[in-house]
Swiss-Prot record:
The gene is eno. This is Enolase. The active site is at E204 (proton donor). The keyword Membrane does not apply. It is found in: Cytoplasm; Secreted; Cell surface. Catalyzes the reversible conversion of 2-phosphoglycerate (2-PG) into phosphoenolpyruvate (PEP). It is essential for the degradation of carbohydrates via glycolysis.
Length: 207
């Protein structure tokens, strides 16, 4: 058992220049875990609620309300709990919120704490995060996915589909899969240039 000692959060900017939450969790043995919450450009109707501030700052996309929830009610609930019991941590935050979609304290507030606790626990055990989450038998990394053409809400063009993605299967190392995808991306760029098409990138980095 290792106890969660301190939880704090600050506002940072994501890759699109929009505010998001960076959460830091410190355990009693000195281990630290940090996490920055991702955010999509489009939102599905079943997605959990990101708590945003509204108002004028950052076009209403500020996350100071969610940060306040992390630094107050979530910290009060989670500090003192066993960081090695991830399910108990997550269940405690779900119970604290009391809604089906985290509309009270914000899914962005909850996700940052959950990820940071997991990373702190992995660091406490001096093992990689994938090993901590996957257990002793975790030996296969997921196949990476790469967005190479953007449309829909992710680009200012007439393409109906939002994402065209590739998955480089069959490589023994992640680095080789990454290289293969990069080569496909650069080859596609050359083909588009040769055909006189735009190679400006969309919201997800695809053409």
């Amino acid at each position: 058992m290792v106890i969660v000692k301190k939880i704090s959060a600050i506002e940072v900017l994501d890759s699109r220049g929009n505010p998001t939450i960076k959460t830091k969790v410190e355990l009693c043995d000195g281990s630290i875990g940090e996490a920055i919450v991702p955010s999509g450009a489009s939102t599905g109707k079943r997605e959990r609620l990101e708590l945003r501030d509204g108002g004028e700052a950052f076009g209403g996309k500020g996350v100071l309300k969610a940060i306040k929830n992390v630094n107050s009610m979530i910290a009060e609930e989670i500090c003192g709990k066993d960081a090695y019991n991830q399910k108990a941590i997550d269940d405690a935050m779900l119970a604290l919120d009391g809604t089906d979609n985290y509309s009270r304290i914000g899914a962005n507030a909850v996700l940052g704490v959950s990820m940071a606790v997991a990373r702190a626990a992995a660091n406490s055990l001096n093992i990689p995060l994938y090993r901590y989450l996957g257990g002793a038998n975790a030996c296969t990394l997921p196949v990476p996915m790469f967005n190479i053409i953007n449309g829909g809400a992710h680009a200012n063009n007439s393409v109906d589909f939002q994402e065209f993605m590739i998955m480089p299967f069959g490589f023994s190392k992640f680095s080789n899969a990454l290289r293969a995808a990069t080569e496909v991306y650069q080859t596609l760029k050359k083909i588009l240039n040769d055909l006189g098409h735009s190679t400006a990138v969309g919201d997800e980095g695809g053409f």
